[in-house]
Amino acid sequence: MNWEEAIVRVLSEERGPLHYVEITQRIISKGYYEPRGVTPENSVGMYLRRNPNLFERVSKGVYKLIE
């Protein structure tokens, strides 16, 4: 599983918006993806911002899955 797949899975399970730090914590705690870098939150935030066709920003740092 890659970052994008892990983000989609977490947001699908939640069925609502989450802050990108919370998304990252859930990905790591559930073992969906093993981060390689020092700042996995930044990686998740980048994926969310760069994929507006998949993720909608609802407030600062908070995103939901576009269905």
Residue spans for each PLM region:
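Charged low-complexity interaction tracts in eukaryotic proteins
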Residues: M1-R9, E14, L18-V21, I27-E67
